[in-house]
Amino acid sequence: MILNVVMVEPEIPQNTGNVARTCALTGARLHLVGPMGFKIDDRKLKRAGLDYWHLLDITYYENLEEFFRKNPDNGNFYYFTTKATHRHTDVKYPDNVYLFFGKETKGLPENLLHDNPQTSVRIPMLNNPDARSLNLSNSVAIGVYEVLRQWDYPKLLCEGKLRDYERDV
């Protein structure tokens, strides 16, 4: 089972750093598709990802054309957008899946969504013209954990343990 997160033209380094941390801690592969609104060595990006960068499987692409050339669609690409009619929870995600997320200000390219209406999905939210979209890194986390939930959280630690400590009584 391989979970891939594809960020198309991300603009805000802190969001990308948060997504990198989510990917590192869930075993998801991160694909960054340019052009990006920041440099890879941006300190805000590194800070948001904390000290998890060594755990991350990350690949960079100059543009979508390069990404699609190196990663052909085998019916396993899902496009997260506010413009979709299908909910992200209505999909049965395959064992090798790619979740696409667009830039913070515009989302995914319209032509990509027009060409893939059956695999475009949305995360439900309020029907309010002032509420355009969820934060990008939050949307990625919601999508990633829905896939992992369906897969029964493979390789993830699902039970925690409190540390022993003495209570003041």
Segments and roles (model prediction):
Residues 1-169:
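Post-transcriptional modification and biogenesis factors for structured RNAs
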